[in-house]
């Protein structure tokens, strides 16, 4: 850190370009899985991306916690960057909702101008979707409690509630997997099937990423990397998790409940 120079000059890192290629391979293998039902490459590339992210997080933890590179100035810019990232993710979901409303309010003649399309047996919103809603809302409450207990220096309860939040996120992912496996329609079944699996699947991916984000926070909390004054990583993870919660409420309302 140079004198009178508030920015952290990051050393050369291979992780951004490597992670970019790994994400590209993951997306390509996902398309292959959709068309050929071969999921092995997608799973391997996804695991590879997770491992690269862990290595990148390791470097960031070393720079912030042990080298003291993240000053208040840097911390504020990181928070602003997280806000921009969440807004960019919001644009993705706005595009999905736009497609959904465009197709449902003015159905195409190719689907007999009816919505939902005929022969589409959709899910009962009072079963797994409602349970998932309770799970995510509860997880938002537990992660807020975890942050509160961290602020008042009660690490034991903070870790307990954070672990409960992660378990709720994993439970949500398991239930969504069960829901997909029992679906009576697939991605190729009209515009409704495409929108449904794209929107809910993209949200499910965010839940998985958020769970990993919180798991890293739990690891750091167990290693006493956080204090009641310095817990930016955990705070950003909470922002992301609440964003995922709110998006699910909109998905449940419009795609499940008001269909």
Curated annotation (Swiss-Prot):
Reactions catalysed, as given in the entry: 4 Fe(II)-[cytochrome c] + O2 + 8 H(+)(in) = 4 Fe(III)-[cytochrome c] + 2 H2O + 4 H(+)(out)
UniProt record similarity statement: Belongs to the cytochrome c oxidase subunit 3 family.
GO CC annotation terms, alphabetical: mitochondrial inner membrane
Assembly description: Component of the cytochrome c oxidase (complex IV, CIV), a multisubunit enzyme composed of a catalytic core of 3 subunits and several supernumerary subunits. The complex exists as a monomer or a dimer and forms supercomplexes (SCs) in the inner mitochondrial membrane with ubiquinol-cytochrome c oxidoreductase (cytochrome b-c1 complex, complex III, CIII).
Protein purpose: Component of the cytochrome c oxidase, the last enzyme in the mitochondrial electron transport chain which drives oxidative phosphorylation. The respiratory chain contains 3 multisubunit complexes succinate dehydrogenase (complex II, CII), ubiquinol-cytochrome c oxidoreductase (cytochrome b-c1 complex, complex III, CIII) and cytochrome c oxidase (complex IV, CIV), that cooperate to transfer electrons derived from NADH and succinate to molecular oxygen, creating an electrochemical gradient over the inner membrane that drives transmembrane transport and the ATP synthase.
EC top class, as a word: translocase
Any one Gene Ontology BP term: mitochondrial electron transport, cytochrome c to oxygen
GO molecular function annotations of the record: cytochrome-c oxidase activity
TM stretches of this protein: 15-35, 37-57, 80-100, 132-152, 160-180, 195-215, 238-258
Keyword Protein biosynthesis listed: no
Record-given protein name: Cytochrome c oxidase subunit 3
EC annotation from Swiss-Prot or TrEMBL: 7.1.1.9
Annotated coiled-coil segments of the chain: none
Gene3D superfamilies cross-referenced by the UniProt entry: 1.10.287.70, Cytochrome c oxidase, subunit III, four-helix bundle
Membrane topology: Multi-pass membrane protein
Location in the cell: Mitochondrion inner membrane
Superkingdom of origin: Eukaryota
A Pfam family recorded for this sequence: COX3
Key words, A-Z: Membrane, Mitochondrion, Mitochondrion inner membrane, Translocase, Transmembrane, Transmembrane helix
């Amino acid at each position: 850190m140079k004198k009178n120079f508030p920015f952290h000059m990051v050393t050369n890192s291979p992780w951004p370009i490597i992670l970019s290629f790994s994400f590209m391979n993951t997306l390509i293998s996902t398309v292959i899985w959709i068309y050929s039902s071969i999921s092995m490459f997608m799973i391997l590339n996804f695991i590879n991306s997770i491992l690269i992210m862990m290595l990148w997080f390791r470097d960031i933890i070393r720079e912030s916690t042990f080298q003291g590179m993240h000053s208040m100035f840097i911390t504020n810019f990181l928070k602003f960057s997280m806000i921009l990232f969440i807004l960019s993710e919001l644009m993705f979901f706005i595009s999905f909702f736009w497609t959904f409303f465009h197709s449902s309010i003015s159905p195409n003649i190719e689907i007999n101008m009816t919505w939902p399309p005929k022969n589409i047996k959709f899910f009962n919103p009072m079963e797994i979707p409602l349970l998932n809603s309770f799970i995510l809302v509860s997880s938002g409450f537990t992660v807020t409690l975890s942050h509160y207990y961290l602020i008042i220096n009660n690490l034991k309860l903070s870790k307990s509630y954070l672990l409960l939040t992660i378990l709720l996120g994993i439970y949500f992912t398991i239930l969504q997997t069960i829901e997909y496996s029992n679906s009576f329609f697939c991605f190729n079944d009209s515009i409704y099937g495409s929108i449904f699996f794209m929107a809910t699947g993209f949200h499910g991916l965010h839940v998985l990423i958020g769970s990993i984000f919180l798991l890293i926070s739990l690891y750091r909390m167990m290693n006493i990397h956080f204090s009641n004054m310095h817990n930016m990583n955990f705070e950003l993870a909470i922002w992301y998790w609440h964003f995922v919660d709110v998006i699910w409420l909109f998905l449940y309302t419009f795609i499940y409940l008001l269909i």
